[in-house]
């Protein structure tokens, strides 16, 4: 008989099953001989297969001489022994996936084989072990091994088991077993594929390709053919480097490629679609050129890859890392790459084979696309593979992930290849606990089937029944034990589910309790927000615990020794601002009959107006009041015993009536009766700006009735003497007096002064006065408020701390002009007058730059300022700074690296030696200090609020480089923008973040203390002092930004607050603003003084030259330079007042009137 071919596995299987052939030494097929002594001498050395076949033949010969029953029993025994011996795992079986199929000797089943078999099996095992040990290095060298499996796995060699080929056979009862059919096929059992040696049933391809260790295929011809096969380019290169550089520069990254939207035009490339990005095209072209820039850096490993992802995957073969874990909960497998994990999940945890061969006549289906590709290459050839590659089916490259529609494993002995392809059973997705219960039930069912199978086979192996009873008893005991274990597991899962449900309910209750606690804390914080408006913005702290304060004064005193709470101006990141309505209800005699604060929904008694003298009488002594539970810094002196009854009354009980009936001081001009309120609503009123154009030293140039107080809001402020600090509250009705809703949202100045005196805090007075400047648009009402503060400070002889003082009336007047004149900062350059005022500084700059031969170019244009050309022509005949000095400063105007600013910060055309730089430096310092006090991270405040240039807000200023430069030198605050957004920030989390940030700030402060130099006026002299610059507490920029977007009134107040600090600093330090000068003379000399100081600091001029230039400036101004440079400042100019906007505070009935108002001489206070 002719030996069958090795390429016909079905014939090999059938022949091996019949026992007709046995493989000898892996070379040919021979007829097995009988195991007798005479023939075995001339036979080849006994191998594992020959020994088993010889044992079977010897058993057959021995049973011929016995009884038929004994013959049948011995036949069953020999067949059973062969089955269990062939079921042992092969030598390549790993520890990770152990498969143990041993005969159930422990169940009581005896193995009483024939004497010949018992004697031959040990003899066959000895040469088998020798053959396995000797053939192991050869097999290891013939098969490419994976380093990862070599390190993480251990090869187990079974000495009594031959290396045989296994396949799956289905028994009549439905279980799957393994039988030997030859060599070199790995075991697949229990639904898990142990593996297959490379090269099995594979023919070598006609067009060899380079296959990477992870499936990346590149043409091998690319490594030898160094020809650029791009469209219309066939250049040949001597090395790969030249080819790669040519393709990248000339084709991939060329200008023409942008027009083609990243398309590969390599000859023969089947990529018909464009790439979304350039890097994708670069990686793709490496498949054509053969470039592999990613090399393994491990010693002795020369692997190279074209993709960085493949190199990272390859590195895991050295490190043993397996980050890709199986996504099924009951599987603990892990892999080094996602592809192997997907193959494992599709093959092990699913019976589906969605990848079917599309070639006609082939019905093969596979679980993953790589197996399908290998099948097409090995079986159908390279031509069919190329065709299939070009016509990919829709599901060709889809990675199959665990699908809830896939049925669970149906049997512990099942195999995925036994299920029919393209079967999708309509089952719903079970829950997690339901799925676990199903798996336990199925496992128990299959265990029962296995026990029953062993019990049935025990009867066949022991016909006499000697071991059947023992096997049945052992099977029942094992079944009962297994059932008990599964039941315990089910109970544990049920208890776990109940615990999870209880935790969810407890979490809901905790959230509700936390919400209630936060609401109570917010109410307490709102009660304390008034002090924060007038305090120096102390460090932030967590919310207070809920408690009921006895009264506000004692609570505020207690706050001196406890961490302060967030205030309204601080814009806390976790507590939204809720305006409160503080009010002091009064009786006719001025005594307090209720609490000092009340919430908006509580109606209080209306204050009563009483007329009293305009000043506080000095003959009325007021006994000091000892605060409740006095604490640091200093307790007031205790009053005499006779005045204890009076100590409970407010210290300024007559001051409220004084404010309600205050009259104009004698220094003011007589006033006209106040206008009646019009029908203007709050929204209309807030959208207008009171344009009281006032120059320094003059009175209000009122354009309505000549009174200077025509606003209903001004009337209310003037009549009631109140200061609004609680924010805007929607009011639908008119506000004709200080009663009703008006009194609900006002805070009496007497209460402010009382708190300032009780705590000896001068910042309360100054901040309240600054707030009054913003909220009081009428200058007359503002004067009433200022006189009240001044009289009380003089009467009480209030002592301010170092560097603080009560502002003078000219300073208050100037700041009031900034915010209540016609200069509207939300509409930059809205009118001709505004544009003229802004041009005062720039015309001076252009005048200094008017020497065109040196290269100075003007900044302003004709469209920007229609009087520019005339002023330049008229001012070109005058000189302020010597020509040679201007020449020396020309080079430094655009190159000032030594001043800490880059060139982008300097204004083009500015040739004054850094005048603008000096002014902007001071503005930035003050602006940052104001932003820190407002708890804002200033590097991003300009983006969130609009750039606050010069203190006027919403300006188009390009000087952002200084902010970036300063940002690098500033302590970084807590920034939550990159962290996960949490809806509710608990007090514990906030405290941890706050303490960590505070520790960092303190450490930075100890290393690099920041010092600021400020000036103040004391007794008519300018005094400089130095103090440590305190750091602001950490703040969440994200929350601040969202709050400013949700509440526009906060943004408006913040811009006013920042602008106030900038202008106040300019006033105190005599720094002129480039947007507005108080008067032309002071502006002219101020700029010249700054220029001389800058030149003197840089060493460009001496003291003598500085004095000479000062005389030159005085001489130039005396030559009527002002009339030539700024002709529109002359009041005799016809068009100067014609373009002024009419006051928005006039009556609505006069809105259509176009008559020019009468010109009146400004009054001076």
Curated annotation (Swiss-Prot):
UniProt note: domains: Only isoform a is thought to bind DNA. Zinc fingers 3, 4 and 5 are the most important for DNA binding; removal of finger 5 almost abolishes DNA binding and prevents the selection of binding sites.
Q: Kindly list the GO molecular function terms attached to this UniProt entry.
A: DNA-binding transcription factor activity, RNA polymerase II-specific; RNA polymerase II cis-regulatory region sequence-specific DNA binding; zinc ion binding
* UniProt-listed PROSITE patterns: ZINC_FINGER_C2H2_1 (PS00028), ZINC_FINGER_C2H2_2 (PS50157)
Q: What is one cellular component GO term in this UniProt entry?
A: cytoplasm
Residue ranges, compositional bias (Acidic residues): 674-686
Q: Which cysteines are joined by disulfide bonds?
A: none
The record's section on PANTHER family has: TRANSCRIPTIONAL ACTIVATOR CUBITUS INTERRUPTUS
How this chain assembles, per its entry, is: Interacts with the MX regulatory domain of tra-2.
Question: Which stretches of sequence are listed as region Disordered?
Answer: 1-44, 58-154, 190-221, 378-415, 663-741, 1137-1165
Q: What does this protein do?
A: Plays a major role in controlling sexual phenotype. Terminal global regulator in a well-characterized cascade of sex-determining genes. Promotes female development. Interacts with tra-2 to promote spermatogenesis. Promotes spermatogenesis through the Tip60 HAT complex and by regulating the expression of genes, such as fog-3, required for male development. Association with chromatin and at the fog-3 promoter requires wdr-5.1, and may also require wdr-5.2. With trr-1, activates the fog-3 gene to determine sperm/oocyte cell fate.
Question: Which terms does the UniProt entry file under GO BP?
Answer: cell differentiation; central nervous system development; female germ-line sex determination; female somatic sex determination; negative regulation of transcription by RNA polymerase II; positive regulation of transcription by RNA polymerase II; sex differentiation; spermatogenesis
The record's statement on gene disruption is: Null mutants exhibit strong masculinization and male mating behavior. XX male mutants are infertile, produce sperm from day one of adulthood, but by day three of adulthood, switch from spermatogenesis to oogenesis and produce irregular oocytes. Mutants display early somatic gonad precursor lineage defects, whereby Z1 precursors divide with reverse polarity and Z4 precursors migrate prematurely. Most animals rectify these defects to produce normal male somatic gonad.
* Zinc finger boundaries on the chain: C2H2-type: 226-251, 262-288, 294-318, 324-349, 355-380
Q: Which Pfam families match?
A: zf-C2H2, zf-C2H2_15
**What is the official name of this protein in its record?**
Sex-determining transformer protein 1
Compartments reported by the entry: Nucleus; Cytoplasm
Show the ranges annotated as biased composition (Low complexity). 132-145, 705-721
Q: Bias regions of kind Basic and acidic residues — which residues?
A: 61-74, 379-388, 1147-1158
Family affiliation: Belongs to the GLI C2H2-type zinc-finger protein family.
Keywords (A to Z) from UniProt: Cytoplasm, Developmental protein, Differentiation, DNA-binding, Metal-binding, Nucleus, Repeat, Sexual differentiation, Spermatogenesis, Zinc, Zinc-finger
* Keyword Ribosomal protein carried by entry: no
The family database entries (InterPro entries) matched by this protein are listed as: GLI-like, Znf-C2H2_ZIC1-5/GLI1-3-like, Znf_C2H2_sf, Znf_C2H2_type
* Polar residues compositional bias, start-end: 75-96, 104-120, 729-740
